[in-house]
Regions:
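Hydrophobic alpha-helical segments typical of transmembrane helices
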Residues: 7, 19, 56-57, 104
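Alpha-helix initiation/capping motif
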Residues: 1, 42-46, 97
Protein backbone atom coordinates (compact mmCIF):
# COMPACT_ATOMS: atom_id res chain seq x y z
CA UNK A 1 0.00 0.00 0.00
CA UNK A 2 1.22 3.48 -0.84
CA UNK A 3 1.87 6.04 1.85
CA UNK A 4 0.52 9.59 1.62
CA UNK A 5 3.99 10.78 0.55
CA UNK A 6 4.16 8.20 -2.23
CA UNK A 7 0.62 9.07 -3.35
CA UNK A 8 1.39 12.80 -3.53
CA UNK A 9 4.62 12.17 -5.45
CA UNK A 10 2.84 9.84 -7.89
CA UNK A 11 -0.10 12.25 -8.29
CA UNK A 12 2.18 15.19 -9.10
CA UNK A 13 4.16 13.05 -11.56
CA UNK A 14 1.00 11.79 -13.29
CA UNK A 15 -0.50 15.28 -13.67
CA UNK A 16 2.82 16.64 -14.95
CA UNK A 17 2.95 13.83 -17.54
CA UNK A 18 -0.64 14.50 -18.66
CA UNK A 19 -1.74 11.08 -17.40
CA UNK A 20 -5.22 11.92 -16.14
CA UNK A 21 -6.46 8.35 -15.70
CA UNK A 22 -3.32 7.41 -13.78
CA UNK A 23 -3.90 10.36 -11.45
CA UNK A 24 -7.59 9.52 -10.97
CA UNK A 25 -6.74 5.88 -10.20
CA UNK A 26 -4.80 7.08 -7.14
CA UNK A 27 -8.03 8.33 -5.52
CA UNK A 28 -10.38 6.20 -3.46
CA UNK A 29 -13.77 5.67 -5.13
CA UNK A 30 -15.23 8.35 -2.86
CA UNK A 31 -12.00 10.38 -2.77
CA UNK A 32 -11.80 13.93 -3.97
CA UNK A 33 -9.91 17.14 -4.44
CA UNK A 34 -10.90 20.39 -2.79
CA UNK A 35 -9.92 24.00 -3.50
CA UNK A 36 -11.34 25.96 -0.53
CA UNK A 37 -10.90 29.37 -2.16
CA UNK A 38 -12.33 28.56 -5.61
CA UNK A 39 -15.72 29.83 -4.46
CA UNK A 40 -14.25 33.34 -4.42
CA UNK A 41 -13.94 33.16 -8.22
CA UNK A 42 -17.26 31.35 -8.73
CA UNK A 43 -15.76 27.90 -9.32
CA UNK A 44 -16.80 24.68 -7.57
CA UNK A 45 -14.68 23.97 -4.52
CA UNK A 46 -14.89 20.16 -4.47
CA UNK A 47 -14.68 17.38 -7.02
CA UNK A 48 -15.47 13.97 -5.56
CA UNK A 49 -15.47 10.59 -7.28
CA UNK A 50 -13.95 9.50 -10.60
CA UNK A 51 -16.41 11.29 -12.91
CA UNK A 52 -16.15 14.60 -11.08
CA UNK A 53 -12.36 14.29 -11.08
CA UNK A 54 -12.42 13.72 -14.85
CA UNK A 55 -14.58 16.83 -15.32
CA UNK A 56 -12.03 18.82 -13.35
CA UNK A 57 -8.80 17.39 -14.77
CA UNK A 58 -9.74 17.21 -18.48
CA UNK A 59 -9.78 20.99 -19.05
CA UNK A 60 -6.55 21.34 -17.07
CA UNK A 61 -4.81 18.66 -19.11
CA UNK A 62 -6.17 19.81 -22.47
CA UNK A 63 -6.21 23.54 -21.80
CA UNK A 64 -2.63 24.28 -20.78
CA UNK A 65 0.76 23.95 -22.39
CA UNK A 66 3.52 22.67 -20.13
CA UNK A 67 1.39 22.17 -17.00
CA UNK A 68 4.11 20.51 -14.96
CA UNK A 69 4.72 20.69 -11.25
CA UNK A 70 8.17 21.82 -10.18
CA UNK A 71 10.00 22.91 -7.03
CA UNK A 72 8.17 20.18 -5.15
CA UNK A 73 8.59 20.08 -1.39
CA UNK A 74 6.86 17.40 0.67
CA UNK A 75 6.62 17.54 4.44
CA UNK A 76 5.68 14.63 6.71
CA UNK A 77 2.38 14.67 8.56
CA UNK A 78 1.34 13.15 11.85
CA UNK A 79 1.55 9.63 10.38
CA UNK A 80 2.09 7.90 7.03
CA UNK A 81 -1.49 8.70 5.97
CA UNK A 82 -1.02 12.48 6.15
CA UNK A 83 1.34 14.72 4.23
CA UNK A 84 1.60 18.35 3.14
CA UNK A 85 3.40 19.81 0.18
CA UNK A 86 4.25 22.88 -1.84
CA UNK A 87 4.57 22.79 -5.60
CA UNK A 88 4.64 25.28 -8.44
CA UNK A 89 3.35 25.45 -12.00
CA UNK A 90 4.42 27.76 -14.81
CA UNK A 91 2.23 27.03 -17.85
CA UNK A 92 0.46 28.82 -20.69
CA UNK A 93 -3.33 28.68 -20.91
CA UNK A 94 -4.21 27.89 -24.52
CA UNK A 95 -7.60 29.64 -24.57
CA UNK A 96 -6.26 32.99 -23.33
CA UNK A 97 -2.61 32.74 -24.31
CA UNK A 98 -1.75 33.94 -20.82
CA UNK A 99 0.94 32.57 -18.57
CA UNK A 100 -0.26 30.77 -15.44
CA UNK A 101 2.20 30.91 -12.54
CA UNK A 102 0.96 29.31 -9.38
CA UNK A 103 2.25 28.14 -6.03
CA UNK A 104 0.06 25.42 -4.54
CA UNK A 105 -0.05 24.24 -0.97
CA UNK A 106 -1.60 20.83 -0.51
CA UNK A 107 -2.63 18.49 2.27
CA UNK A 108 -3.23 14.86 1.36
CA UNK A 109 -5.03 12.30 3.49
CA UNK A 110 -4.62 8.67 2.47
CA UNK A 111 -6.82 5.75 3.37
CA UNK A 112 -6.08 2.13 2.43
CA UNK A 113 -3.32 3.22 0.04
CA UNK A 114 -5.53 5.66 -1.92
CA UNK A 115 -6.10 9.41 -1.84
CA UNK A 116 -9.14 10.05 0.33
CA UNK A 117 -8.86 13.83 0.33
CA UNK A 118 -6.51 16.28 -1.35
CA UNK A 119 -6.99 19.89 -0.31
CA UNK A 120 -5.07 22.41 -2.40
CA UNK A 121 -4.67 26.10 -1.72
CA UNK A 122 -3.74 28.53 -4.47
CA UNK A 123 -3.93 32.16 -5.55
CA UNK A 124 -7.40 32.49 -7.08
CA UNK A 125 -6.59 35.92 -8.52
CA UNK A 126 -3.93 34.18 -10.62
CA UNK A 127 -6.51 31.58 -11.67
CA UNK A 128 -8.86 34.34 -12.86
CA UNK A 129 -6.10 36.44 -14.44
CA UNK A 130 -4.76 33.57 -16.52
CA UNK A 131 -7.87 31.51 -17.27
CA UNK A 132 -10.92 33.74 -17.45
CA UNK A 133 -11.60 35.38 -20.86
CA UNK A 134 -11.30 38.92 -19.47
CA UNK A 135 -8.99 38.07 -16.61
CA UNK A 136 -9.86 39.55 -13.23
CA UNK A 137 -12.35 41.91 -14.89
CA UNK A 138 -14.68 38.90 -15.06
CA UNK A 139 -14.84 38.97 -11.25
CA UNK A 140 -16.24 42.48 -11.05
CA UNK A 141 -20.01 42.68 -11.13
CA UNK A 142 -21.45 45.27 -13.47
CA UNK A 143 -24.43 47.22 -12.18
Amino acid sequence: MKTAKELLETYLTAISAGEMERAIALFADDGGIEFPYFGSVNLPIRYQGPEALRRFFAPVMEGADNFKFKNIKIFPGEDENHVTGEYEVDAVIKKTGRRYRQLYGGRLIAENGKIKHLREFCDTVEVARAMFPNGVKDLVQKD
